[in-house]
């Protein structure tokens, strides 16, 4: 069987397991180190055979061990802020290869971002390449710590690896704070220090900034991690965000506490009751642990019944909130 038929990206370790199961595989062990002999664990390693590529990642010790089908493999090792490494490997059935690879010293930016009082603040930074420097792609768009050309942080002290070049930085924390722009040059193999304070120019005593409709992985319709979602909200200066995952009553408070964001954002347990028609948010709701969906009600077609079920739910506070999302005026509000 041709395990690599056609252009595709496969799970690297699964490929090795299948190759061994079929009886033809060679072993490979790669170790990545920087000039100080410290492990490089943040790299991506692409293996190409013909027109097919598989990707792997080293562990925290900078090691990647796997099996590969026999053949002439091209290997490309890349990491933000380091030069790419290219090598060729001839994998033979029943034989093992060991390689130690030395990567360049990493370049990037170290941030110290504060509020006006000097305390650390959640924030977002966007990197825009200028004068021929390409804008970076730091990762998938639903990840806080490196998403496309942005980085969202739960605190003001953080580092971002960047390839050498010239960048415009835009530091923000939502619409109530002034943004800060800086242009920097990142030298090869060095980190640049950036310090800045974000001024809150819009005063809102007695009011809080809220977002009543958010989701993360437990909702089942997206792959944004819960911690990533909360970091994103805090970086945009959302001060209150009820927990509104699809069809289950959840409380984000433990995540907020683990991230150290108690002073920046708060939540209460709730849910979005969801089906093939109207969607409704409700909070607060008390989770009923060890019950299906933590005791959430079941969705029905009639939006009036859903609203009543949420309002009358045993865990719903009498002064709580129920609203309908993205309403269809004909389906949901027509006279009956």
Predicted ranges, named:
Residues 80-98, 151-154, 159, 175-193:
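Structured interaction patches on ligand/partner-binding surfaces of diverse proteins
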Residues 1-58:
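Terminal accessory/anchoring regions of large secretory-pathway or extracellular enzymes
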Residues 70-81, 125, 164-174:
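A short, solvent-exposed beta-strand micro-motif common in secreted/extracellular proteins
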Residues 39-43, 49-67, 131-162:
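Short, acidic Ser/Thr/Gly-rich low-complexity loop/linker segments typical of extracellular
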Residues 174-176, 180, 205-336:
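Catalytic cores of extracellular degradative/oxidative enzymes
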Residues 60, 69-70, 93, 163-165, ...:
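Surface-exposed loops/turns
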